[in-house]
């Protein structure tokens, strides 16, 4: 059984992209990463359309969409990080300003990530489908993204210091 065969029936378009990415790894790493990027885009858009939280708008940038999927609890932090890794790998390899072509090593790394991501994708889609069928449509909290929470805390603290300084300048010190 080939690597992406399980996708063939349920997600034929995703299967097509993944299968092509696998076929092109050795002979055309650029094409492999292009197809991996198409597979990534398909997964992100499909998750966005099927998330349980109401979608206010469809994001144009994959970065924003992945972040929102994580914030809404549709996907976990690890899944989001891996989506970003593949996104960055594909973007960097296919950057038109880059003179050299993508390497086979980059394409193999992309394929490895793609393999993991398709497993996670099907699991999340199955979970969302089950939640809709059972009427339990509130996803369980996926946990706190510690990196983002720490960054937000620093920003809030800095904002507080700036606000205090501004108030002191405006109203003067009590001394």
Give the residues covered by each predicted segment.
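Membrane-engaging insertion elements
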Residues: 171-175
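Amphipathic alpha-helical interface elements
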Residues: 1-169
């Amino acid at each position: 059984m080939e690597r992406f065969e399980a996708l063939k029936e349920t997600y034929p378009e995703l299967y097509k992209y993944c299968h092509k990415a696998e076929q092109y790894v050795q002979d055309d790493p650029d094409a492999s990463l292009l197809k991996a990027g198409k597979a990534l885009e398909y997964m992100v858009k499909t998750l966005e359309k099927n998330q349980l939280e109401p979608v206010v708008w469809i994001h144009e940038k994959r970065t924003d969409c992945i972040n929102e999927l994580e914030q809404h609890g549709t996907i976990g932090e690890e899944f989001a990080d891996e989506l970003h890794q593949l996104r960055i790998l594909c973007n960097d390899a296919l950057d038109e300003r880059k003179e050299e072509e993508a390497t086979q090593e980059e394409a193999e790394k992309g394929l490895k990530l793609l393999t993991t991501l398709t497993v996670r994708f099907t699991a999340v889609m199955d979970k969302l489908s089950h939640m809709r069928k059972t009427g339990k449509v509130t996803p369980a909290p996926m946990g706190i993204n510690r990196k983002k929470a720490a960054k937000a805390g620093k920003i809030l603290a800095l904002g507080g210091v700036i606000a205090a300084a501004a108030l002191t300048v405006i109203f003067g010190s009590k001394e």
